[in-house]
A protein has these predicted regions:
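Proline/Glycine/Serine-rich low-complexity intrinsically disordered segments
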Residues: 33-291
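N-terminal secretory signal peptides that target proteins for export/translocation
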Residues: 1-11
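Bacterial N-terminal signal peptides
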Residues: 12-26
Length: 291
């Protein structure tokens, strides 16, 4: 997936932005009545990463885009918002450089060249880590993994609470995707029913043409809590993580020469994970959880 965001995972094209906001706000309201979902720890709580000296830093400009909700987008008031935007601000606060921090939005296609040309210092926009990008840039440690999940039609009785309960049921998946390959590798005995698009897959699930589906947890989480699902379905089993199929996770991209800044960002991410601030931001945008 050269020079792309985690394209198969973005909500763009999955449903409209208005529907995304509706799902988000309804999720926020409902989450107050639910136990808080946990964010898996990606940093060892015992690990203490050194905090580099940033006293000579003149500016830290984060670059992002506005087409990757709920990670980075403009809200209904035109304000730059999202998980990544809030995280960038928390990183600056943790490093005690908030007065030196800026966040600028550019078209996604321009981010790579802008970083290379020193028009910004770090890209926080959901770039997929690829060997090509690693030859030119460095990446922070991942701060969020996007898993795969099953979703089931609640009208279909299942004998169990794990994927084994789906053994006699058709499971939909989008043809030609990493999730189709992952389903075949992880669950070779399940009966996969391929569909050409996500819309076709979810329509079939809603209409009980398939009993379950296997796809990206981010998309499924917002769909099941949105009016589009008509409360037909729920997440089931999982999560399932695989670096081979799903990549290294969401990271921050920097220039190779900026090793001190990279170490500082890793220090901030580890601290935010340890003190619970990363979890707070996660719950703000994923109140139903991905895991």
């Amino acid at each position: 997936m050269m020079q792309s965001k985690l394209a198969s995972l973005t909500l763009k094209g999955f449903f409209t932005f208005g529907l995304f906001l509706g799902a988000l706000f309804s999720s926020l309201a409902a989450s107050a009545q639910q136990a808080s979902p946990s964010l898996p720890l990606l940093f060892d709580a015992r690990e203490r990463l050194a905090r580099p000296d940033l006293s000579s830093l003149v500016r830290l400009r984060f670059l992002t885009s506005v087409d990757f909700p709920p990670f980075n987008f403009t809200d209904q008031n035109g304000k730059l918002s999202g998980f990544n935007v809030d995280l960038a601000r928390e990183i600056c606060s943790e490093l005690e450089i908030s007065d030196k921090c800026q966040i600028q939005a550019l078209p996604f296609a321009d981010l790579r060249d802008a970083l290379a040309a020193s028009q910004g210092d770090a890209v926080i926009a959901g770039f997929a880590v690829t060997p090509e990008l690693r030859r030119q840039f460095v990446f922070s440690r991942p701060y969020l993994m996007l898993p795969a999940r099953f979703v089931r039609n609640l009208a279909v009785p299942l004998d169990g609470k794990t994927a084994a309960a789906l053994s006699s049921h058709p499971v939909g998946v989008v043809r030609g995707t990493v999730h189709e390959a992952m389903l075949a590798a992880f669950f070779p005995t399940l009966k996969a029913e391929p569909f050409d698009t996500k819309d076709a897959l979810l329509a079939a699930l809603k209409d009980r043409k398939v009993d379950a589906a296997f796809a990206d947890a981010l998309q499924l989480s917002f769909w099941v809590s949105s009016p589009a699902s008509a409360k037909c379905c729920a997440l089931f089993d999982g999560p399932y993580l695989s670096e081979h199929f799903l990549g290294e996770g969401i990271t921050i991209m920097l220039r190779q020469k900026d090793s001190v800044l990279t170490s500082a960002i890793d220090h901030a991410l580890a601290t935010l994970s340890r003190n619970g601030r990363l979890q707070e931001i996660y719950l703000r945008y994923f109140p139903y959880g991905l895991y």
